[in-house]
Amino acid sequence: KEVVHIHAQDKVGTAQAGKMDMDEYNGLISNSWGICGACTSMTTANSMCMVAEALGMTLPGNSSMSAVSSQIRLLSYQAGKQIMNLVKENITARKIMTVDAIKNAIKLDMAVAASSNLILHIPAIAHEAGYDLPWWKYFDEASNEIPLLSHLAPGGPNSIKEFDLAGGMRAMLKELLPRLNGDCLTVTGHTLRENVEDAENYNHDVIRSLDNPVMTEPGIGVLYGNLAPEGAIIKIAAVPHGLWRFKGNARVFDSLHDGLDALRAGQIHPGDAIILRYMGLKGRFGTTAFTFQEELKGLPELYNSCAIITDGRFSGGTSGLSVGYTSPEAALGGPLALVK
């Protein structure tokens, strides 16, 4: 099994709790961090690279290539030449990043269980392009249409390197093409369909087809309920199956630091529903609960039995029963502010 950086991050809590030899932990760190470039798992950086390709804004195959490969060196040269062609043909970003292209990116998000933070970044891109539409609605619709086609770390067993060797984003987009708008223009000057028509899938265990998905549920889900009348986001592909149904007592913290203090003091118990609130965009600039989630993951008796619910966000590499972006956030009087 390939060791990637997320495996070292998952052991932070274990090491801090004294349940792992520090020499062993340092060895794991030394051998799990890859070369320069984006992370080796499905975190926000890789997610945004894949979104850029699904939008049509990169040359085909760019998003999963190694940062120091001969492939990327050749592609960078080709990109420079293609920019000049785009200028000559008057093909601009606004002609490429259409509403349909953005919807393609959202569907790709579901198929690869990309970062939950795309709920921020994709609407921000759309806003800059002049499309102020109900993007949460489109995420919700896509979550009911697109199954998980690739189970990448942290939720699954495969790395980005394995994804690339299987055929990368071109193979993924070809498998997903029946659910996409293949007529969208891309920076090649050709359509998305034309870009992937000759793509090969070299490993059908890593990149699945629509007829044989990893699971019929999407990688990312939009949740609604009495705590989130306007929605919340969860990375379904990274939730242990034993936690797909959950009931627990609320443990409420009004800041990340209070929650971490309680966790480190042994005051969090198996089965708790941990509420981390006032961490949203208006309350505290969209604070990430990733540190809490990672330390919790190092304590299996808690990670495998507890839920985290926050109006803040997580790292793209989050896993476990972790619900973020709960809306309206507590600072705006959302229901999360009433939990005791």
Describe the function of each predicted region:
Residues K1-E329, G334-K340:
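Catalytic or ion-coupling anion/metal-binding cores of large enzyme and transporter domains
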